[in-house]
């Protein structure tokens, strides 16, 4: 039912994750990303009224790619009434812990989930595909249990991560997870948006230089590509 409580196991896991990440930060290109699970959108969420009748609210759940999207193309979100809930540096573990606060409690009709870049970059520890995939599946299941539709999206391409050059096999890990997400979405009849295929470039499977300056985060041109793809999927899902 809507607002159903998490199990004791879920709560214990969430508490452990929260304690593990408390106070952690990531330094990259002169910027400091806060990795804690504090309510970064607490004020915005509190100020957001519940949707009116027939309103089809859409929340975008993500990391700095989503956060940067809102900052780079604010009109895309404002004009469509979309709500961005991206936090730079975060992994799927942290998404899962704040999913109730930043998605379920906002009563959207639909959530768009984009995850795993920072998992693969090992922002909060060694990468385990099964665990990252499981976190994403858990978010889908939580959404469905609360009558929220879901659009899953691919992790964007990246040949490497400037803040963690020790990761040498990012393209392989991204491709593997994306294939698994696509299969899961098809099996469970979940809309799936493939940003990856439209944005990948070269034999090293990098994010197309036309769409990025640092190899990971999209520029305005990159977000143009993403908007065209996601808008079609949202319209189809909510019609």
Name each region found by the language model.
Residues 1-59, 71, 106, 235-239:
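N-terminal secretory targeting modules
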Residues 5, 81-83, 189-191:
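Conserved beta-strand segments of alpha/beta enzyme cores
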Residues 55-71, 88-91:
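Catalytic nucleophile-elbow at a beta strand-turn-alpha helix junction centered on a G-D-S/GDSL motif
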Residues 61-64, 85-88, 114-118, 153-157, ...:
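Active-site-proximal beta-strand/loop segments in catalytic clefts of secreted hydrolases
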Residues 67-83, 93-133, 156-160:
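Oxyanion-hole/transition-state-stabilizing segment in secreted/luminal serine hydrolases
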Residues 112-116, 136-140, 146, 150-153:
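Conserved, well-ordered alpha-helix/loop/beta-strand core segments that scaffold catalytic motifs
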Residues 128-137, 174-178:
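Charged helix-capping and loop-helix junction motifs
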Residues 157-239:
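Catalytic His-Asp segment of secreted/periplasmic serine-dependent ester chemistry enzymes
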């Amino acid at each position: 039912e809507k607002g159903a409580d998490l199990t004791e196991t879920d709560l214990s896991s969430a508490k452990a994750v929260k304690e593990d990440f408390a106070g952690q930060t990531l330094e990259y290109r002169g910027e400091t990303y806060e990795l804690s699970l504090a309510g970064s959108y607490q004020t915005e969420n509190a100020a957001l009224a519940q949707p009116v009748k027939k309103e089809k609210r859409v929340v975008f759940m993500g990391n700095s790619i989503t956060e940067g999207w809102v900052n780079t193309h604010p009109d895309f979100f404002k004009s469509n009434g979309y709500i961005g809930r991206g936090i730079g540096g975060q992994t799927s573990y942290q998404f899962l812990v704040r999913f109730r606060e930043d998605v379920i409690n906002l009563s959207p009709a639909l959530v768009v989930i984009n995850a795993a870049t920072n998992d693969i970059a090992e922002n909060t520890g060694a990468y385990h595909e099964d665990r990252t995939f499981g976190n994403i599946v858990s978010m889908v299941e939580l959404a469905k249990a609360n009558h929220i539709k879901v659009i899953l999206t691919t992790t964007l391409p990246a040949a490497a991560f400037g803040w963690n050059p020790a990761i040498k096999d990012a393209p392989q890990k991204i491709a593997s997870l994306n294939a698994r997400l696509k299969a899961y979405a098809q099996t469970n009849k979940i809309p799936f948006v493939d940003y990856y295929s439209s944005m990948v470039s070269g034999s090293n499977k990098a994010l197309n230089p036309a769409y990025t300056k640092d190899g990971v985060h999209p520029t305005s041109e990159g977000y143009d590509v993403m908007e065209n793809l996601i808008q079609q999927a949202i319209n189809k899902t909510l019609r």
